[in-house]
Amino acid sequence: MDVHGKKASIIGAKRSGVAAAELLAKSGAKVFVSELGEPGASEAERLADCGIPWEQDGHTDRVCDADFCVVSPGIPRTAGIIRRVLEQGIPLYSEIEAASWFCKARIAGITGTDGKTTTSTLLHRIAEADGMKNDYRAFSVGNIGVPFSSLVLDMAPADLAVVELSSYQLEGCETFRPDVSVITNITPDHLDRYNGDMQLYAAAKFRIYASQRASDTLVYNFDDPLLRAQFSGNGRGFPFRIVPFGIGNDVPGSGSEEAFFYDEGMIRHLTAKGISEVFSGEDFLKSSFRGRHNIYNALAALAAAAALGIEESVARKAISGFSGVEHRQEFVCSLDGVEWINDSKATNVNALLQALDAVPGSIVLIAGGRDKGNDYTVLFDVVRRKVVTVIAIGEAREKILQVFEGITRTAGADTLDDAVALARESAEKGQTVLFSPGCASFDMFENFEERGRLFKRSILALNPC
């Protein structure tokens, strides 16, 4: 899209909004930024350096004096300013969409409810290794932390942009076209944004492939019921190539000509030539990178790498040296025979369930935060089998205590420090303390990263590991 001379309003002056503003201004657009609150000092300085005008403490009618608008991902379609923009027929895009207009590089897009950051990190690691051999660069951008707009002008045609995508970022995508798209899974999350409608949430995720063509590839989790219904059976008429991944020997029967699957301790690759063994799951399921969910993450990354033409030997070596991502079932330390695991990124019940499945032995669970309408009853079976104590915190504390009363021992804590102290008292040698909230962090913390860091700090304050 040629933006030169066009008027662009950016709604939201946080990290991605300011990055989009800078990109569009450099590309010749007449940019205006509107922020409901107040831009941070760094963001205000960047806008001033580019000569971009902005308003704060509210949105005026000037926002609608635009040829198009770019909205920050945290602003829902129900916000008053967004309704005004749409009512006036002004095109509304996401920062990802705007950045894609200027992208010369290949794109691998990764979305899903859970696993997208680990899968993105794995694929980026694989691509970096391949790029060293084949003279290209791999960039990691998007929901993972660095806005796509910040780096897109640095990318050459041979390079690869690994773009992690939330449903919020995909909502405003119209022409965004990944060469390879990956959907890790779709389970209930963020439904407050979608009026409790799972189909609306899924539709936002499915925008990742809306512009893909015959030369492109979609990689999806065959074991996810919603995704299987959408994509299995010879591609269901989609124009692009479809590659499923999953656990078990039923994946090759998905109807696709190619698949990656884990069976009998081995990752295998189905092609027209037959089934080959990629490598043993034990090679990457180490103490710091373990669990069934990480098999899925590895399968997704391997399938995406293959679709990008990366040799399996390169991918295998890169994955074998991977130690995981911070706040995602992160081993913190062993203290008096008790292992402590930080899974602060578990912001929904499905992620909590995966963590409980992944951790061997008896567990003291610290959970809670801002509830998202969670159904904790799906955890009953694994809690009965593995959890000796549930320690509940945050706004969801009373709900969690009530749900698990009679299922296992329960206790409430006012603060995270108190919860850690209770866990220290409760856990016995050979057990694991798992911090996997299953809830959003915003009732007590700035974000899940701060929550995880404070959990680790609290452990180390008890006794340096």
Swiss-Prot record:
Keyword Ligase in record: yes
Keywords, sorted A to Z: ATP-binding, Cell cycle, Cell division, Cell shape, Cell wall biogenesis/degradation, Cytoplasm, Ligase, Nucleotide-binding, Peptidoglycan synthesis
Residues noted as binding ATP in the record, renumbered to the chain: 112-118
Subcellular location: Cytoplasm
Pathway named in the protein's UniProt entry: Cell wall biogenesis; peptidoglycan biosynthesis
InterPro entries to which the protein is assigned, alphabetical: Mur-like_cat_sf (IPR036565), Mur_ligase_C (IPR004101), Mur_ligase_C_dom_sf (IPR036615), Mur_ligase_cen (IPR013221), MurD (IPR005762)
Enzyme Commission number(s) from the entry: 6.3.2.9
Catalytic activity: UDP-N-acetyl-alpha-D-muramoyl-L-alanine + D-glutamate + ATP = UDP-N-acetyl-alpha-D-muramoyl-L-alanyl-D-glutamate + ADP + phosphate + H(+)
Highest taxon of the lineage: Bacteria
Pfam families from the UniProt entry: Mur_ligase_C (PF02875), Mur_ligase_M (PF08245), MurD_N (PF21377)
GO cellular component, one term: cytoplasm
A biological process term (GO) from this entry: cell division
GO molecular function, one term: UDP-N-acetylmuramoylalanine-D-glutamate ligase activity
Keyword Ligase: yes
Its biological purpose: Cell wall formation. Catalyzes the addition of glutamate to the nucleotide precursor UDP-N-acetylmuramoyl-L-alanine (UMA).
Family matches, as NCBIfam families: murD (TIGR01087)
Entry's family note: Belongs to the MurCDEF family.
Protein name as it appears in the record: UDP-N-acetylmuramoylalanine--D-glutamate ligase
